[in-house]
Amino acid sequence: MSELIFRSYSELREKLLSKKVSCEAVTAAYLNRIEEKKELNAFIAVFKETALARAKALDAKLADGNAPGKLFGLPMAIKNNIAIEGERLTCGSKILSKFNSIYDATAIKKLLAEDAVFLGSANMDEFAMGSSTETSYFGATKNSVDPTKVPGGSSGGSAVAVASDCALVALGSDTGGSVRQPASFCNIIGLKPTYGRVSRFGLVAYGSSFDQIGVLSKTAEDAALVLEVIAGEDAQDSTTSDEPVKPYVNEVASFKLSGLKIGIPNEFFTDALDKEIEAVVKAKLEALKAGGAELIPVSLPRSEYALATYYILATAEASSNLARFDGARYGYRSEKQSDLMEMYTASRSEGFGMEVKRRIMLGTYVLSAGYYDAYYRKAQKVRRLIREDYLKAFETVDVIAGPTSPIPPFTLGEKMDDPLAMYLADIYTVTANLSGIPAISVPAGSTKENLPVGIQFIGKPFGEGTILSIAKAVASL
């Protein structure tokens, strides 16, 4: 591998600022790596000319004596549901396959202001609906650990880009586990911040009360640095919090494992959990205990209802959010146009994939007259109870730990005809989205077949610094 491919941004930054390497050379090396690994299908589009031009401009900025940004020269991949002005914003869907964004997302503006370099847009499950990155209109993404396996989803392209050294850091989005589950499957770190910590302006909506932009990286320090840049209140997103952005990088650097109280829910270790994954996760927890942490049993009694609750509420929000894609204003328009209603119906039927249509229909059903109270309203009540379970547990512990996924990476195509089996892959991740709290997946080891296993740490609201610090501690064990 090229000596211009790095494992951490701190290594790259030292070389860039000492002028031992140039932004242009590093960017070119990553673009070459993307070409070498194109069979993995991690990218929908590669910004070769734009990236090289930006890198060249950054080199000139440094040569002129101007202060470099916090992310100077950081090569990044961006999930293709996050708006970048002038670039295609497809959401992995036929209906938006030719749509170009006319503005930058707030997170993108913040990254650009700190001198990051965007290498390309990462592949994803269509409209972020999936757990395998197989529902993309642009084809499935393959896991770089084992190309016969899925990389997880929906941010599978972002995860593979980082895991295969085609980007140093990537942005993804997490509605029910879409950053953490692919991070687990690809043996990297995946952070979902607290709801409202990062602006959703410019993130194409799936479930507006669940969605959060997250970070995928190989080190906790890199995730902390990028979060520090993109977090914060935004006038363009009324759901962002005015909670001050903490110095996450400093928190990670000064963290001590001794005395940390880790809650272990019995509900996360059931017969549904793969036995090899259970053994790997428990071994990592014992290693944390040996390092000074305290393991404390906790209970999350309503977690058994989490998956059903999530798929009622998230699909209801998707039904509403995706109503805007009708062929009239932008996106794909069917040639069947005998009247307006036929144009609407045909454009959506032809433009959306099977999984998206399935979730729109389910969401429309639970919102319909006669079923709203039985399903949607009841699910909202259960959502509140699930959050209360977490807040009660956090009265006695600092974080909650368990497996990220109940199963290891599965074979491409294995679950495409069984949506319920696919949905079960989210069983441990959806509770953090339902509760609006931060969570992170960290590599914990591997199965006998050398497939990655992730361990998940769920934190208190706005406790990103703590879970990022634990991620660093786990990496050193």
From Swiss-Prot:
So where's the catalytic machinery, residue-wise? 79 (charge relay system), 154 (charge relay system), 178 (acyl-ester intermediate)
Q: Which domain of life is it from?
A: Bacteria
Q: Name one GO cellular component term.
A: glutamyl-tRNA(Gln) amidotransferase complex
EC number(s)?
6.3.5.7
Q: Which GO molecular function, any one, fits this protein according to its record?
A: ATP binding
Q: Does the keyword NAD apply?
A: no
Catalytic activity line of the entry: L-glutamyl-tRNA(Gln) + L-glutamine + ATP + H2O = L-glutaminyl-tRNA(Gln) + L-glutamate + ADP + phosphate + H(+)
Q: Which UniProt keywords apply?
A: ATP-binding, Ligase, Nucleotide-binding, Protein biosynthesis
Q: Provide the GO biological process annotations.
A: translation
Q: Which InterPro entries match?
A: Amidase, Amidase_CS, Amidase_dom, AS_sf, GatA
Main EC class the enzyme belongs to: ligase
Q: Which NCBIfam families match?
A: gatA
Assembly description:
Heterotrimer of A, B and C subunits.
According to its UniProt record, which protein family does this protein belong to? Answer: Belongs to the amidase family. GatA subfamily.
Stated role: Allows the formation of correctly charged Gln-tRNA(Gln) through the transamidation of misacylated Glu-tRNA(Gln) in organisms which lack glutaminyl-tRNA synthetase. The reaction takes place in the presence of glutamine and ATP through an activated gamma-phospho-Glu-tRNA(Gln).
**The protein's name:** Glutamyl-tRNA(Gln) amidotransferase subunit A
